[in-house]
Amino acid sequence: MYYQNVSVGQLIKRVSRFTVEIDLNGTVEPVHMNNTGRNKEILIPGSLASVRYVDNPNRKTHYDLLAVQRQGRWINIDSLAPNHVAKECLEAGTLKLPGLALPYAVHPESTWRDSRLDFAGKAADGQSWFVETKGVTLANGTLAAFPDAPTTRAVKHVHTLTMAQAEGYQAFLLFIVQLPDIRQMTIYRDRFPELVTAITTAKQNGVRVLAYDTMTGPDQITLGNEIPFDEHLPFSEINLNSL
């Protein structure tokens, strides 16, 4: 996935939940951030940041924040990116769902029961499936973790996947880590222990959990390699005083 109309500037500060200030060639611009996470270890003043110009007179801001460079790697924090990447790869067959024959019929944003899941589809052999995608921006070294903030919505989605699996669908929980050079993925138990329990139960009932890292830059994010997932691995956040 490549972005157009991209510029690189310097992050000044986070102003509000959805707004940061970026210095673009000496001009301070308010920039929309499409990510509700805490992102404390990413939004460090002085960091390089990439933004996309949006030509929309009805908007209060003219730019969207795409990625921030931290410790030599670009971290994509566009919360819409994981679904775009997943859709492209599912349709192209470059993201293979274990046990399901290619090609896939892919239908985004499908409602099942009282939940809306990111993707529904059917494999070449007729097996129906669901995929719920979660973007991941929290990491410490080569270990990534989800969530960055408590999320009851994610628990609800996992419960829905578990029910769908019991009714004959093949259900998948897909984590897309929005930065490169990640070797393992876990759930941040200290942040939201209920999610660990929900995922463990889902796996025991046949739900498949997949995790991938990505190749990122100021103007791109593409699917990388599948990485091991273990919801029980311990995780601790980066010490901000060391940054």
UniProtKB/Swiss-Prot annotation:
The lineage of its organism: Bacteria, Bacillati, Bacillota, Bacilli, Lactobacillales. InterPro entries: SfsA (IPR005224), SfsA_C (IPR040452), SfsA_N (IPR041465). One of its GO terms (molecular function) is DNA binding. This is Sugar fermentation stimulation protein homolog. Signal peptide: none annotated. NCBIfam families: sfsA. CDD domains: SfsA-like_bacterial. It comes from the Bacteria. Belongs to the SfsA family.
